[in-house]
Amino acid sequence: MEKYDEDIALQASKFLEDLSLCDGHSRLYGPVGDMLLSNDHILVADHRGRRLNGSLTQYLPHSSSDKVYPLGSSQLRSMNGSRGDGYMDEGIYKSDVALPCYSGISEKNKRYSAELYRHSCGNSFEGVPISAKQGGITALYSGGKMSNSCMSATSPRSSMASSASSSQEHSKYSSPRSSISSNALSLDKFSSPRSSLVVPGQQEKYTSPRSSLGQYEGGVLSPRSSYASTTSDTSKHSSPRASLTSYDCGSKPSSNRTSGISMGYDQRHISPRSSTASQYSCTTSPRSSYSDSRYVPSGNPDLDGVGGHGSLVSPRSSMCLQEGRSATLGSCNPSVVSPRSSISSHSSRSSRSSRGSMGAYTDLTVPSPRSSMLGTSLQEETLVQDLGEACHYKVLTQSPPRQEQHQTITSSHDLNSGAVASYNFSSAKGSATVHRFKLPYQVTPSRESGPSQAERRLEALTLELEKELELHMKKEYFGICIKCGKGVYGASQACQAMGNLYHTNCFTCCSCGRRLRGKAFYNVNGKVYCEEDFLYSGFQQTADKCFVCGHLIMEMILQALGKSYHPGCFRCVVCNECLDGVPFTVDVENNIYCVKDYHTVFAPKCASCNQPILPAQGSEETIRVVSMDKDYHVECYHCEDCQLQLNDEEGRRCYPLEGHLLCHSCHIRRLSVNVPPHQPPSYPMHVTEL
């Protein structure tokens, strides 16, 4: 079936050649023997034919002597897909603007019309207006020999049209609604009427009136799928919602909503919204801001004559940066820059284009009248060999530029356009070298990881301001730091240890400098160490030994009376109670006692009751009565006979008799038995306090 369709296409093309209404071979060439295109052969579209966002009206052909009119007067189809009156009975639509195909050899002395059939999904559509004017830019196209004409058709609504030469004789046509035209290598591939990307192969290629990009060989995918990988050699129709097609000689049906399918080989398409195209991509994002193009062949080595690869710069492009890395004989690569592209980088060995970014084909550039900055030497050289000889392309990547015998042909028949495209052709034989153009631009260097210098400076200034604010703020005064001798302000700066006041930054480990506020520390010979340095750095050799047990004190230390103790070893020798945090006392032999046991052992005893005289409850003072060189409790110092409390008052004084405590009355009574001739003298009472 495919072969049958192929034969029908061949017969149809031959039939159109025989019915061509174009003039003969004599008007194609000028008086010079070389192939110089006449200005009358430049086909332009009426500037009033379309608006950027309006409806499409009928295109008026240029009023030149070599007009090419369609077979029937018809009107272009409207943009909403409705069929106009111009459709024929057979479903073939005639376009008002056609591309004249200029033959370059004697065997084909005819100029063919572009009234060609367009097939899409089994339906025939209109022929494509090959030449269109966007913003006053004129496109020039020419053909090759043996029907190997490479025609690049730019739609009035297309942002970019690119084509590649081929020795095949099959024609591939995209849908009128396709964004990008695509044709495969050997089989007829028909894209969906709503496909978003159609990539022309190595045959004659015609882009749709709504095509955004004509790219190299490949299939067609749905406009709503992100990626589709095609590796089949057979002809398969993809989904009408496919977005992008990988070009591996065919197309496979892809999912309608595929988010990501990996591509085969090195020919990959970038997502329609990616910012930068990879170096192996052929089609960049329609909204990418910059695209670099590499590793894509630029021409067909079998083409002879002047190639029809022109480079069109969009009217609103800001900068067109072009790098010529190869020179071709009789062929130029077309590059159409998007209307709002910022920088377009062109390389003759690559082709990358985006609807909103750039188009990359070099060697012939038509500057835009609205472009902000274009290279001064964007008109590149092309050498044309004699018509009868076979032409071979030699790619020179980095050869020194040279120029030979230029002839300039300026296209002048441009209606309502503000720009004239200049083309330089060289009649000399041999390989041509292309100038390398570099326009001045500045790229913001990538920032290293971490904060930038400005951010660090800002942080430093912020810290300085915070410190100044802290100094000026009124804070609580704690005292003088014992280490630095400066005042301590604020609770965050105060640290108390070993009974002294420090700044938080002053009380640090003398070994590692770590701040010890709120951490365990060790004081060794007046130096403070953190726990890690003290335990694991050999400082345990200098640690004190417990006075009681004789072991090293590795944890908390308790110092008393010039000696060091473990807290658990500091106990009363009588009751064995821990005296950590409890009042204690020692004897002359450095034995430790609690207060109670100390008084029990060392307190004076009452001569009356023979009990120790202890301090009163809640008091540390001991009150006792000393009489006749004896110690008495206050309550024990009374008369033994009448129990009268004795003191220094008159009538209560003590009159001892034979070692007994007696008052004056009781003393007389005991003496009345043996009345003495004289009254015995009384003894004074002394009250002492310990």
Curated annotation (Swiss-Prot):
One of its GO terms (cellular component) is nucleus. It is found in: Cell junction, Adherens junction; Nucleus. It comes from the Eukaryota. Residues 152-186, 335-357 have a biased composition (Low complexity). Pfam families: LIM. Residues 479-540, 544-603, 604-673 form the LIM zinc-binding domain. Its main location: other. Disulfide bonds: none annotated. Gene3D superfamilies: Cysteine Rich Protein. Residues 204-214, 223-233, 240-261, 272-292 have a biased composition (Polar residues). One of its GO terms (molecular function) is transcription corepressor activity. One of its GO terms (biological process) is cytoskeleton organization. Residues 151-316, 328-372 are annotated as: Disordered. May monitor slit diaphragm protein assembly, a specialized adherens junction characteristic of podocytes. In case of podocyte injury, it shuttles into the nucleus and acts as a transcription regulator. Plays a role in the regulation of cell morphology and cytoskeletal organization. Acts as a transcriptional corepressor for snai1 and snai2/slug and plays a role in regulating neural crest development. Involved in the organization of the basal body. Involved in cilia growth and positioning. PANTHER family: LIM DOMAIN-CONTAINING PROTEIN JUB, WILMS TUMOR PROTEIN 1-INTERACTING PROTEIN. Belongs to the zyxin/ajuba family. Interacts with prickle3. This is Wilms tumor protein 1-interacting protein homolog. The gene is wtip.
